[in-house]
Every structure is written in C-alpha cells, then in structure tokens.
Amino acid sequence: MTLTVTVSLLSSPLHSVCTSAGARFTGFAGWELPLQFQGLMQEHLAVRERAGLFDISHMGKFQLRGSGLRAALQRLLPSDLTTLLPGQAQYSVLLNEAGGCLDDLIVYWQGIVDGVEQAFLIVNAATTDSDRLWLTEHLPPAIALLDLSQDLALVAIQGPQAIAFLQPLVSCDLAELPRFSHTVTSIAGQPAFVARTGYTGEDGCEVMLPPAAAITLWQQLTAAGVVPCGLGARDTLRLEAAMPLYGHELDTDTNPLEAGLGWVVHLDRNPDFLGRDRLVQAKTNGLERRLVGLELPGRNIARHGYPVAIADTTVGIVTSGSWSPTLSKAIALAYVPPALANLGQELWVEIRGKQVPATVVKRPFYRGSQFR
C-alpha cells in the first residue's frame, strides 16, 4: 500500500487578486506564492524601468514589546541599535553562539509606545518558526513577542517610479521618508505600516496592513499601471543587486563577514553580542572564504551548489546564479578562498559536467535607484 502525504500550503490574503491577475503559483517556505504573472523578463524590467508590485505576505512579522527591548536585541544582533531613533530601521543578522547566521532580518525601531519600548522585526518565511523559538528562548521574560505573520498582509512596490505611484494612496508625505525609515499612515481607511525598504536594488516601499486594505491597495496600484511581479523576478532583481538569500548566501555555517555583511557588524560599538568572540577570531585570523560575484560567458547559468574550481581543484561553490535581464549576461554569487577573491580572477564553474570559465567581478552587478 502506498501512503500519500498531502502538505497543505498557506495562502496569502492576496491569493485571490493574484489569481485574477493570471499568477502562476509555486510552493515556497510552506506558502503558495506567485512565481510569475506575465513573464519574468517583463516583470524584472518593469521594476528596473518603472515600478513593480510584489506580494510578500509570506515574510515573518514579529512585534516585540517590553522594558529593555533595545538592549535585549543588541545582545542577539551584531549591529549597534543604540543610535536608532523611532522611525528608523536597521538591516542585520541573527547569530548563533558560533557566529553563524540564523537569519537576516530588518529591525524597525518604534521607540516608546504607550510607555513601553517597541519594535517590529521582518524575518524570512523559511525561518519564521525557528526565529520565533530562538527569540523566545533568548529574550528576557519581560519582552513579549506577538507573531503577526498570518494576520497582516505585506506588499512591496519597487522601482524608480514606485514612490510616485504610491503617494496618492497614502496620507503621509513619502518624500519625507528617507531610506531605511518607516511610518504609520492610512491606506483605504486602515492603518498601514510603510517602510522605505526593499529587496530589488531599486527605490520603493514595503507596506504592512490588514488584508482587506491590502487587496484595495493592490487593485489601485495595478489599475494605475504598476506591474504585478512574482518570486522569479524578485530573485533575479535581488541577485543583480547582490543581496543575500537565506539558505543560499547565508546559513548557520556562514558568518556575516564571509558573506560581505561586515557593514552590519559593529564590533567597536556593540561589545557583547552572541557569537562576537567567533567573529573577532575570524577577523583576527583571516576568513576562510569570501562571497564574490562571477560573470560567465554566453548563457552559461551557474546554479546553486555548482562547484567552482581553479585548474583541476575544487575551491568553492556557487550560491546563486541566473541570467541577468538588465545586463544581458550570466551572473552568479559564489564562495571562494580570499586569495581567489580579487577582481579579475579567472576561475571555472562546472555546469552539467562541463568546465565553463568565470571571472570575479564587482558586486553589486547592477546599482539601481536605491543606490542613487
């Protein structure tokens, strides 16, 4: 007798409007999510040239409240949170005792709300459960964690014209919202959390709000001409911007220094965080590997897990790779020894049993409106 096990996937509050827009769905981190709508290439270029709209409701959403919250978070993250003002945000990594990355996340600091310190954490969907458990075990009892992951929708509007499309629909002045800042506004008569953040390399906002208001926002933006986009375009966009994907560039065996995230590690300003000794040791003794960008000839696509070699010796591994719609070339991210991480270094990637040349190039591969 054959036993069939059916795995039930979670659905986003925007599933129905995505279906109506022609979405092709896929399973990702326990959710059924749009892979693409009209096509990856069209969606990717819409974000680079104008504006695109993503349903990212699968992301984990934690509200943290309690006395001493800032100090408690500072103990679990390598970043200095002491200078964050209410309305500011910090990208960081959640570390284990060995300095490995449990997740990458964004801390949205809200300051004192009703007399108590408060922050929002947006974490990866695949690690939502493990992050919640880790935080619950490592934060003081005085800190309350409210998991709103399945209660609120989250959409991202990204692209050089994203702000212009969103502005008429919100009650705040988005021109006054700097990069990596956030505010509470009103959308469709409902409170909405709007952050000037994203995962594409372009300018834009991520908006967290009740499901009904999210559906209204989605319909208004698409009616105005914003292109709905799926996970496929989100991945190629973040790869061009050389942004890490957990499970590819980041995992528990990888420290943030190796991953090129030294800019979120504030050893001089955060003297006591979990995994700090290991990071100091790695910095003192030298890293064993470094994340690099690779460019390959033709349409040779290096996928996750493909070996990287020099001569006949395997020296590294590809973490992500794709055709770049913006640059019209094959690009990849890979880990290699520091001695082989210099720009211009010639390497080989094994693709379907064939050795294909690859050159170490500067990251990010493309600098969008986020960097301008």
From Swiss-Prot:
One of its GO terms (molecular function) is transaminase activity. Its EC number is 2.1.2.10. It catalyses: N(6)-[(R)-S(8)-aminomethyldihydrolipoyl]-L-lysyl-[protein] + (6S)-5,6,7,8-tetrahydrofolate = N(6)-[(R)-dihydrolipoyl]-L-lysyl-[protein] + (6R)-5,10-methylene-5,6,7,8-tetrahydrofolate + NH4(+). One of its GO terms (cellular component) is cytosol. Keywords: Aminotransferase, Transferase. It is an enzyme of class 2 (transferase). Signal peptide: none annotated. It comes from the Bacteria. Gene3D superfamilies: Aminomethyltransferase beta-barrel domains, Aminomethyltransferase fragment, Probable tRNA modification gtpase trme, domain 1. InterPro entries: GCS_T, GCS_T_bac, GCST_C, GCV_T_N, GcvT/YgfZ/DmdA, GcvT/YgfZ_C, TrmE/GcvT_dom1. One of its GO terms (biological process) is glycine decarboxylation via glycine cleavage system. The keyword DNA-binding does not apply. HAMAP family: GcvT (MF_00259). The glycine cleavage system is composed of four proteins: P, T, L and H. Belongs to the GcvT family. NCBIfam families: gcvT (TIGR00528), PRK00389.1 (NF001567). The glycine cleavage system catalyzes the degradation of glycine. This is Aminomethyltransferase. It comes from Synechococcus elongatus (strain ATCC 33912 / PCC 7942 / FACHB-805) (Anacystis nidulans R2).
